[in-house]
């Protein structure tokens, strides 16, 4: 059975939504640039040999609608190349990598593009979830309960299923973070400390040249070249973030200092069979060892990485002790903290270059972006096995184990 290997990775800088460096770029234009950048790194590959372009997008509507994956293929002059657009919210472009893995293992293709994009700045043109009166009234009581809790103080989380009630599948992500923090006993100070850690580590990694290794500069319509992420801030201190006000509840724990911002960005991987890579004389960057995906209550979605990671590790025949570096997507410190603790991940292996609290989390981009970052990190720190994992809106988790090959 062939192995699935990653032979190229590229990502854009990550812009802040609505006010950042990429706010003028359409999602299709940005994706096409980054897919082309990934292909340019492997000129040995004939584009006619690509079997499918699979694009992850968290909210594929508006400018990101119309089956954006296919739009991008045609835009790039590849009418022969099929394209699909996949949403699994925050893990959309990890899902596309999983699909490439499965297709290669099944013998149904040798070369796939796994890409991801989100341009929240452009969401004013519409998103897949933005239409009024589209929620199923079946969940109206659950939504009302969420709204009531959001306005109250001292609320703890209790699984509504235990009372024979439905959970709220439409719940805002910030409310799930508040629920999980209370359920797992995570304090505001711990969350702030983690947020500061992310920013400080990102600042150090920037100084060492780590992040610039994986970023493909993007040229804007006016000719401006963007080559850095907007999010990292130098000199962030615990004292500086301690005064930030809670965002989601009167007595909330989540602030702008301990969660990710809203962002724009795109990333792309070229995944092929090891036999095809050998045929082309390519040295793979990494091998996809295994993946995992899990579900749990939508109201505590942030805990999803735990079960998904256990799945992926079991399928890989590895334990957490075998993993050299771990990237947990930092949607909220409130979810990273209980996840890494319950997976027994040492902090000196976790998000060692900073994470999404600093660099950002464009939903559909994140899966492929973290894969690119993990490969970069395994190379930079000379390590072998990496685990990528994230929580997913709607109450899910996803994970992937990779092995560095070069």
Q: Which positions does each model-derived feature cover?
A:
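Flexible glycine-/small-residue-enriched beta->alpha junction loops
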Residues: 111-179
């Amino acid at each position: 059975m062939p192995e699935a290997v990653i032979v190229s990775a590229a990502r854009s800088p990550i812009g802040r939504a609505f006010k950042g460096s990429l706010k003028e770029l359409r999602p299709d234009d940005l994706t096409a640039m980054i897919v082309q950048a990934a292909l340019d790194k492997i000129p040995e590959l004939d584009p006619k040999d690509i079997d499918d372009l699979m694009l992850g997008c968290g909210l594929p509507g508006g400018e990101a609608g119309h089956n954006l994956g296919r739009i991008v293929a045609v835009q790039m002059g590849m009418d022969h190349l099929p394209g699909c657009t996949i949403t699994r919210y925050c893990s959309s472009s990890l899902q596309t990598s999983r699909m490439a893995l499965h297709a290669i293992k099944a013998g149904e293709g040798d070369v796939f593009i796994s890409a991801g994009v989100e341009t929240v700045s452009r969401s004013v043109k519409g998103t897949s979830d933005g239409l009024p009166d589209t929620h199923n009234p079946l969940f109206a009581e659950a939504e009302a309960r969420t709204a009531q809790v959001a306005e109250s103080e001292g609320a703890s989380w209790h699984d509504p299923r235990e009372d024979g009630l439905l959970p709220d599948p439409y719940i805002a992500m910030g409310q799930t973070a508040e629920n999980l923090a209370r359920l797992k006993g995570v304090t505001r100070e711990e969350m702030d400390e983690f947020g500061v850690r992310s920013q400080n580590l990102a600042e150090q990694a920037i100084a060492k040249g780590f992040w610039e290794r994986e970023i493909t500069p993007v040229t804007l319509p006016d000719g401006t070249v963007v080559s850095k992420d907007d999010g990292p801030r130098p000199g962030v201190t615990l004292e500086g973030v301690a005064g930030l006000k809670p965002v989601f509840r009167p007595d909330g724990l989540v602030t702008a200092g301990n969660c990710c911002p809203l962002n724009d960005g795109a990333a792309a991987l070229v995944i092929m069979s090891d036999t095809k890579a050998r045929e082309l004389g390519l040295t793979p960057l990494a091998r996809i060892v295994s993946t995992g995906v899990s579900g749990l209550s939508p109201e505590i979605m942030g805990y999803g990485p735990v079960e998904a990671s256990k799945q992926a590790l079991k399928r890989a025949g590895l334990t957490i002790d075998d993993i050299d570096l771990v990237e947990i997507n930092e949607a909220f410190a409130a979810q990273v903290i209980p996840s890494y603790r319950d997976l027994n991940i040492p902090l000196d292996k976790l998000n060692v270059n900073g994470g999404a609290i600093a660099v950002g989390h464009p939903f559909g981009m994140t899966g492929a972006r973290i894969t690119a970052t993990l490969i970069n990190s395994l190379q930079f720190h000379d390590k072998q096995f990496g685990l990528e994992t994230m929580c997913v809106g709607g109450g899910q988790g996803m994970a992937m184990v990779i092995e560095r090959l070069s």
